């Protein structure tokens, strides 16, 4: 799975720390998510999408063709 967290975060002018605070996670978690090293729970994915002004997690998280992480 790949994410568009970094792109949407920068579009909003947010730092990793600011996004982390909005979502309720550490900056390290945001870094891991942006680098594709961590797959979030469904609840966390929804929190991130909302924090980035998106209604659908599919706007942020993109499943690979084969469904792999």
From Swiss-Prot:
It holds the Pfam family HTH_3. SMART domains: HTH_XRE (SM00530). PROSITE patterns: HTH_CROC1. Keywords: DNA-binding, Transcription, Transcription regulation. Gene3D superfamilies: lambda repressor-like DNA-binding domains (1.10.260.40). Disulfide bonds: none annotated. InterPro entries: Cro/C1-type_HTH, Lambda_DNA-bd_dom_sf. One of its GO terms (molecular function) is DNA binding. Residues 5-60 form the HTH cro/C1-type domain. Residues 16-35 bind DNA. This is Uncharacterized HTH-type transcriptional regulator MTH_1328. It comes from Methanothermobacter thermautotrophicus (strain ATCC 29096 / DSM 1053 / JCM 10044 / NBRC 100330 / Delta H) (Methanobacterium thermoautotrophicum). The lineage of its organism: Archaea, Methanobacteriati, Methanobacteriota, Methanomada group, Methanobacteria.
